[in-house]
Curated annotation (Swiss-Prot):
Record keywords: Nitrogen fixation
Listed GO biological process terms: nitrogen fixation
The name this protein goes by in its record: Protein NifY
Family note: Belongs to the NifX/NifY family.
CDD domains: NifX
Classification via InterPro entries: Di-Nase_FeMo-co_biosynth, DiNase_FeMo-co_biosyn_sf, NafY_N, NafY_N_sf, NifX-like, NifX/NifY_domain
Any one Pfam family match given in the protein's UniProt record, by short name: DIMCO_N
Gene this chain is encoded by: nifY
Amino acid sequence: MTAQPPFGQAPLPAHLALRIALAARSLKGVDTAHLLRALIAAVGEPITEARLRKLRASRLRTRLLETCGEGVQSTLTDRQLHSALGLLKGRGVRMPEDPLPIPEPYRNGEFQDSVRIACASDNGERLDGIFSNCTRFLIYQISPRESRLIDLREPGPCREDEDRHARRAELLADCQLLYTLSIGGPAAAKVVRAGVHPVRLARARPAREIVEELQRVLATAPPPWLAKAMGAEPDQRIRFTQ
């Protein structure tokens, strides 16, 4: 069933309709129509990406029980609920028209005065992921004059005895910056310990926009810590701060 609002209301964007349909499939005893009604009750209308991003599991559970009745309570597990919530927020959902970008070869030292950044991503070449559970990291090498996507790094599943945050931080140890939609305190500490500076964004954006913005900063007045990461001499770093 296609996830669309009742007759007379504006249709959902295709990417949100897909998320809702996939989330409904992950909830035992809940169909797409019931989930859609529960979401409208939980976040209001129109259903938007920003509103879904703020949705909490407890509120979703309450609205599902109100919409579907007490019968669903015995079949609705925490695991199902958190899986559905992740899908609603776009984690691991990739639209067919969002092909993965293709990295280009890069030799270390090829770009002078450059930094390497990681962007948490779930879809195509978008910065739309959360550090702790994004599908992959887009790795860019950026100088004031050039930029290049040099790698796609997928953390993959962790063993039960592994620290997933430390494992992800180690994956980015050759980067200077991490861009993500969200990162918790303990995870951020592990990222910083790996020598990477985390940057949290308020909303999903095309990764290339971030690259272009950072290029402008590098070309004008990077802060001292970033100038150091670029390999600038101390006297140059002083000039950057003036």
